[in-house]
C-alpha cells in the first residue's frame, strides 16, 4: 500500500507499528470500536453541494480528559445537533492533539495523530488487526522542548503533485510556529502576533496554502491563511468581532463543496456548539448555529477523527 501520510510513515509508524513503544503504562489495549467506525464514516460525508443538499454533514470528535481516558462524540448537523457518545477507553494523558487520521490496509486499520505529553511531541498510533475491536496504542517520541506550546493543529494535503503535511503550534511567547515532520519535527517558519489566540483548528488545506480558524480571548473569530512557501507570512482576516470568546477547543470537518462544520467547546460549562461556516470571506462569511449539546465527557483536549485521504478541508 502506498501511504500518503508521509510524516507519520517517516516517523517509523506503520499499520504494524512494531518499532514503537507505549507512551505510558496502561496505554495499550483500549476498546473503542466506535473510534474505528467514526474514522471510516468520514469517507461518506457530503463533499459536493448536491450531496450536502440531501445528506446531513457531520463531524467526529475525539477527546481525552484529565485522567487520560479517551472518548468523544459523533455529531450530525441537525437542529438541535444529533450527538452519539464514542466508547471510552484508557489512553494516556495528553495536553494537546492534532487530527487523528484513519488509514486502512485490507482488514487492518490504524489511527495516526500528533500529541503533546508534558514537554514532548509524540506521533501516536492506534492499530486494529482484522475484526478486533481492541486496538494496540503506541507512540514514537519525535522531540522535546514543547512545554511552551498549548495548541497544535495540522494540515494533510494529499491530492495533486504538491502534497504536504505541516504541524502548527501556538506558543506561549505569542508566536505561531510551522513544522515539517519526518523522524523529528523541523521548523519551517514562525510568525509573531498571536498572543491573543485562545483556540485554533484547520479549515482548508490546498496545494498553495493552509487556512486556520482561530478564536481570541476577546471573543473575535479570525482566519489565518498561511502560504506553503517559506518564509512564513500568514494573512490574518477578521470574520467576527465578538461572540466566540468562551471556546477553548475547535474541531472542523468539511461540509459540502466549500463549507465547514465546526464544533466549538466551552471547557467551563462543558458545552459543545455546532456551527455551519460557509467558505471564509472575512466579515461576510456565512455562519449558522445548529445549537449546543452537553459535552458530558468533560475533556479539555478535542481533535478531529477523519480519514487519511480526506475529506480534504476546503473552507477558506
Residue positions per predicted region:
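Secretory targeting and sorting signals
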Residues: 1-29
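C-terminal region of N-terminal signal peptides and the immediate post-cleavage residues
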Residues: 18-65
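Hydrophilic extracytoplasmic domains
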Residues: 28-30, 256-316
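Repeated scaffold domains used in trafficking and secretory/extracellular systems
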Residues: 42-58, 85-112, 140-163, 193-209, ...
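Structural motif
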Residues: 58-83, 109-134, 164-166, 173-180, ...
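Short N-terminal edge-element motif at the start of the domain
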Residues: 127-186
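Predominantly a core beta-strand signature of beta-propeller blades
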Residues: 135-139, 184-188, 235-236, 283-287
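Short helix-loop boundary/capping segments
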Residues: 177-248
